[in-house]
């Protein structure tokens, strides 16, 4: 039986991040799908609720440890399975990497995740086109700032020439932006880095369309 078990959903940005990190570290894990819209959302079912009462994915199981929050999971993986590191061990670069990752995971992503979009349409009666405009507006605002920051930090990847937590966060967010038809040509630095990252096996294998539960 595998020690590492990842509960996720093929299109979840947060689960996508963890898949990338697991692949970069070449860790073998069992993937268990939690369908976010089937049967009212499997994340609300009792079995998953016991794992995470917040009813959000991803959740990582490692032996007796049950951990949620994608960035916490990746930091745990980085400390437990450190080769290769995604968060520098010390120095200013450590905090630069964390800050840029949080720009994506804490500022850009949360206001556009599935439960927010579902609330806009199901509870507030927002039409799909207006919902899509909402999505593009907030992604654009976030990407404008991120583009400017990465112009100063980027080398081959988001921070210099080594893969980091920022790269792990960037690609899933770009994937979602493209799903909602955001014009990525406005962010050439993000676009170039994302294209470079997507060509790497660890990122390609983690892509939503390559997951067993993709539909």
Curated annotation (Swiss-Prot):
Record-linked InterPro entries: Glutathione-S-Trfase_C-like, Glutathione-S-Trfase_C_sf, Glutathione_S-Trfase, Glutathione_S-Trfase_N, GST_C, GST_Zeta, GST_Zeta_C, GST_Zeta_N
Top EC category: isomerase
A Pfam cross-reference name: GST_C_3
EC number: 5.2.1.2
One GO MF term: glutathione transferase activity
Start and end residues of each GST C-terminal domain: 90-215
All residue ranges annotated as the GST N-terminal domain in the record: 2-85
Coiled-coil zones: none
One GO location term (cellular component): cytoplasm
Biochemical pathway: Amino-acid degradation; L-phenylalanine degradation; acetoacetate and fumarate from L-phenylalanine: step 5/6
PROSITE patterns, A to Z: GST_CTER, GST_NTER
Key words of the record: Isomerase, Phenylalanine catabolism, Tyrosine catabolism
The reaction(s) this protein catalyses: 4-maleylacetoacetate = 4-fumarylacetoacetate
UniProt-listed GO biological process terms: glutathione metabolic process; L-phenylalanine catabolic process; tyrosine catabolic process
PANTHER family cross-referenced by the UniProt entry: GLUTATHIONE S-TRANSFERASE YFCF, MALEYLACETOACETATE ISOMERASE
Similarity field: Belongs to the GST superfamily. Zeta family.
Protein name stated in the entry: Probable maleylacetoacetate isomerase
Protein species of origin: Vibrio cholerae serotype O1 (strain ATCC 39315 / El Tor Inaba N16961)
């Amino acid at each position: 039986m595998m020690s590492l078990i990842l509960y996720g959903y093929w299109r979840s940005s947060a689960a996508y991040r963890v898949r990338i990190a697991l692949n970069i570290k070449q860790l073998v894990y069992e993937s268990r799908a939690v369908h976010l819209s089937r049967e009212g959302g499997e994340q609300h079912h009792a079995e998953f609720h016991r794992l995470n009462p917040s009813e959000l994915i991803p959740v990582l199981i490692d032996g007796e440890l049950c951990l949620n929050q994608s960035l916490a999971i990746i930091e745990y993986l980085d400390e437990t399975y450190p080769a290769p590191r995604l968060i520098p061990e010390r120095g200013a670069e450590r905090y630069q990497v964390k800050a840029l990752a949080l720009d994506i995971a804490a500022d850009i992503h949360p206001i556009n995740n599935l439960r927010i979009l579902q609330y806009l349409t199901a509870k507030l009666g927002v039409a799909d086109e207006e919902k899509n405009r909402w999505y593009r507006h907030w992604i654009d605002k976030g990407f404008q700032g991120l583009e400017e920051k990465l112009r100063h930090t980027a080398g081959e990847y988001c921070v210099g020439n080594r893969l980091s937590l920022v790269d792990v966060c960037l690609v899933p967010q770009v994937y979602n932006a493209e799903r909602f038809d955001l014009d990525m040509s406005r962010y050439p630095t993000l676009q170039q880095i994302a294209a470079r990252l997507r060509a790497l096996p660890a990122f390609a294998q983690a892509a939503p369309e390559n997951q067993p539960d993709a539909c």
